[in-house]
Swiss-Prot record:
PROSITE patterns tied to this protein: ADENYLOSUCCIN_SYN_1
Family indicated by similarity: Belongs to the adenylosuccinate synthetase family.
Gene: purA
Active-site residue list: D13 (proton acceptor), H41 (proton donor)
Name assigned to this protein: Adenylosuccinate synthetase
GO molecular function: adenylosuccinate synthase activity; GTP binding; magnesium ion binding
Catalytic activity: IMP + L-aspartate + GTP = N(6)-(1,2-dicarboxyethyl)-AMP + GDP + phosphate + 2 H(+)
Pathway(s) it belongs to: Purine metabolism; AMP biosynthesis via de novo pathway; AMP from IMP: step 1/2
Amino acid sequence: MPVTAIVGGQWGDEGKGKVVDMLAQEADYVVRFSGGDNAGHTVINPMGEFKLHIIPSGVFYPGVKCIIGNGVVINPDVFIRERNELISRGVNVSNVFISDRAHLVLPYHILLDGLEEEARGNKSLGTTRRGIGPAFVDKYARMGIRVGDLLLPEYLRERLEYVLECKNQILTKVYDAAPISLDEIYETCLKWGKELAPNIRETTHIIEEAISQDKKIIMEGAQGALLDPDFGTYPYGTSSSPLAAGGCLGIGIGPASVSATLGVFKAYSTRVGGGPMPTELLDKTGDTIRNEAHEYGTTTGRPRRIGWFDAVAGRFSCQINGMTTAIMTRLDIMDILPKISICTAYELNGKIIKYFPANSGELAKCKPIYEEMPGWLCSTKEVRNYDDLPEAAKAYICRIEKLIGCQMSAVCIGPSREQTIYK
């Protein structure tokens, strides 16, 4: 079967964009399956550095068709801005398509996202305030507006009128905010429809044909497994499933079509926003890693929280994704550390556990049990063969493989395509 799922094994920001960019040169399709523009993928290639939030990372290969699947929520302004920037920098975007079943992020979603976060006060979830959560709420409450609706003016106005009647009640009576104008948002949607019309497709048929022709398809995940609404650190997570199984729903295929699931892990842990993170480093070591790695959110610009590699969480991620192989990124960041720790278990209420608790309150109480390993204190950035890595670096990789139960097929020692070592 020709479908490979690429998923994040931690809390997102693992380097999936680079991995997709690496593998897309041999693919026919790259399909984004979840999230929205709350996710940011940084890609560095011969054309320069690009920060993508909604368009799949395979866009830099002219022969690759890029699809934004039905499982993604789309802010048309963000898509149009991103598409136009790519065009201005010489990238061919003629092969970028959007599922007509994908839901829209509308102005009231963004407004409500901000108002809801403010209302939570010091218990805020740390959302990106881009309207992603409210858009998914509407999707499942049957109040969403879909991309295909933009091409049906009469139906679109009817839907907007129905939805705004409810949204304006919330805005005015709960938050004492100004109501949204039906005429204004309708006109905006009509403009979006004209802009997006060349990109909108019934994509499930395209993907079905591609599979029947044995084309190579990459399912590009967003965020990471530990943010999943079912298996992540609920409620401190995302609104759609970043798991490989979520990819099947997010592009419209059955699980039997997926031949491989590739998990992406950083050599250490990072997280943005609220929620428990057992291995978080609140000391100089954390600051050193953050500064060396420039760990600031692609989407929000917020400093990322830093921690040691959490093998308990990593093993859980491998399990719930059914990972067949993995890639480790940012190994080079560890070059400067004399000693490196790996979390192999947790202590919870005086007992040693080796599972990832479902309750965020319990996870917050977990104390990491560490195994310390020697660092290598030399640069790996120019290494191109696995055997040429320092012995301590290979020992670190090998130990993580054993702890999470998944082999690494490659290791990344820098942001460019060339800085990748295949095992």
